[in-house]
């Protein structure tokens, strides 16, 4: 219905703002991964987006069909975009990534604390330097885990 259509529209805006396609040769994988998480964080902490996310959680509690649809079109979709970038990087020999979907799930875990804080209404520190350092550190560890042995 109407709520699903609103979710679809907002999802399209979200993906346009957050997850641009990874272009091998043009984009450095590290920078791409860092920028995607920073875009996600900036989008997530906007009050109107945080409120909408809370509304989605409330609505999906009453509708398993809506929950599945939102998950398939939202979190799973963005994980697949990252999995695709990881697959390209693997094919180019930049990393070793035999399970790109699992790796994409692990990657998004980097900002899980921020997501939970937003969902629970806990203020998120807006110190971008600290966030940048944290995300860079985590992406470094993530990529180290995908080096050829």
Question: What are these model-predicted stretches?
Answer:
Residues 5, 10, 19-53, 100-107, ...:
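Hydrophobic alpha-helical connector segments
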Residues 42, 46-47, 51, 55-57, ...:
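Amphipathic alpha-helical packing segments from all-alpha helical-bundle domains
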Residues 1-4, 13, 66, 70:
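Short amphipathic alpha-helical segment with a characteristic S/N-K-E followed by hydrophobic residues
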Residues 68, 90-140, 146:
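Hydrophobic/aromatic-rich alpha-helical bundle segments in the mid-to-C-terminal region
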Residues 20, 73, 123-126:
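Short glycine-enriched, charge-decorated loop/helix-capping segments at active-site entrances
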């Amino acid at each position: 219905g109407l709520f699903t259509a609103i979710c679809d529209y907002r999802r399209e805006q979200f993906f346009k703002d957050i997850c641009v396609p990874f272009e091998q040769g043009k984009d450095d994988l590290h920078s791409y991964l860092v920028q995607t998480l920073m875009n996600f964080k900036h989008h997530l902490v906007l009050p109107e987006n945080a409120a909408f996310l809370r509304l989605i959680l409330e609505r999906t509690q009453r509708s398993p069909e809506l929950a599945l649809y939102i998950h398939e079109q939202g979190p799973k979709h963005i994980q697949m975009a990252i999995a695709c970038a990881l697959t390209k990087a693997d094919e180019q020999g930049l990393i070793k990534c035999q399970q790109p979907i699992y790796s994409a799930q692990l990657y998004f875990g980097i900002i899980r604390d921020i997501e939970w804080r937003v969902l629970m209404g806990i203020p998120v520190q807006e110190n971008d330097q600290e966030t940048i350092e944290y995300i860079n550190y985590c992406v470094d560890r993530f990529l180290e885990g995908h080096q050829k042995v």
